[in-house]
């Protein structure tokens, strides 16, 4: 997703928006904000999310920062290691919708129980509505429906 200086990229901003909605709807859960600091970034992705969410009224006591990861696999491994044991039964993942499939595959290997998907949608007009619709149904079917019916 990335940070431009200290400003979240469009992709990261959509994740922040989705995380805010989810956290406000579920006020008793903690959140691990995961993402390291890349080249050209003045702060880590995790810090950018923390700053934005606390500015929007999310209690900082609920937010756990994971600022060491450099890729999706590390994001997941490091984040799961920071969660209290009882939260491994259900994990909610907030990421961009286009990224959700790969995240789910990595999570299956990591072993948490139930995974709640919280997709963040990009606002870019040039993305094909047909492609998004088809992919959305495929991801829901493969990653949510089939495991629930198994």
Residue spans for each PLM region:
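A transmembrane-helix-recognition feature enriched in membrane-embedded lipid enzymes
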Residues: 128-150
